A protein has these predicted regions:
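Bacterial N-terminal signal peptides
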Residues: 9-19
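Bacterial N-terminal signal peptides that target proteins for export
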Residues: 1-11
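Extracytoplasmic loops and strand-loop junctions of Gram-negative outer membrane beta-barrel proteins
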Residues: 27-29, 63-64, 105-109, 160-167
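Residues that define the transmembrane beta-barrel architecture of outer-membrane proteins
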Residues: 26, 38-40, 72-78, 114-120, ...
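Gram-negative (and chloroplast) outer-membrane scaffold detector with strong preference
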Residues: 48-138, 184
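Short strand-turn segments of transmembrane beta-barrel domains in outer membranes
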Residues: 30-37
Length: 187
């Protein structure tokens, strides 16, 4: 997927979340997926409660790191979605309907793999309350994703030459969400 399309999707998601804040006073929370942090993919998200049992969220992940010349994993990912909370928003059980768009490139030795991922899924999570403002939320989700994969030598992926011969893609069932999220409630 082209970067301009990705940027448009992110802007629409941000606009949607911001427009919901004018409805009435909201609770807002900042989130970070600790599992992504462990694999050196810093991420940050925002969740806005717009009804007693409903919230919208937007998360971004970026991994620009190149560990060595022979091993690297670069990633840019955006996730937006809707949560239905069974009791009260930001507490206890909830269902998740979300979409994700990811562009990633990994390299080891002289071989490189690039993929683009566009998926949507349904998930479940539970919010463990640590204190008044801090929650820990494990969640998991499954769904369908369109994955496009490019395979070749490292120098071919950077220039684009020779990559077209090794392109594969298609729809497949996938684990669309696996998270251990630390959530800080702002208000």
């Amino acid at each position: 997927m082209k970067r301009t399309t990705t940027i448009k999707i992110v802007l629409v998601a941000i606009f949607s979340i911001v427009s919901m804040t004018s409805v009435r006073a909201q609770r807002v929370a900042l989130t970070s997926n600790l599992l992504e942090d462990v694999v050196l993919a810093p991420n940050l998200g925002v969740e806005v409660v717009f009804a007693d049992t409903q919230s919208l969220f937007l998360e971004a992940t970026v991994a620009p790191f190149k560990l060595t010349n022979h091993y690297y994993n670069k990633c840019l990912s955006f996730r937006a979605g809707y949560k239905y909370w069974f009791n009260q928003a930001l507490y206890a059980h909830h269902l998740i309907l979300d979409g994700v768009v990811t562009s990633s490139e990994s390299g080891w030795g002289d071989t490189a793999l690039r993929y683009e991922y566009l998926g949507a899924g349904l998930g479940y999570g539970y919010s463990f309350i640590i204190n008044e403002r801090l929650n820990l939320i494990p969640s998991i989700g499954v769904g369908v994703a369109y994955v496009r994969q490019y395979e070749g030598h490292d120098h071919m992926l950077d220039t684009g030459y020779g990559v077209q011969a090794t392109v594969t893609g298609g729809f497949m069932p996938m684990l669309t969400r696996l998270a251990l999220t630390l959530q800080y409630v702002l208000k």
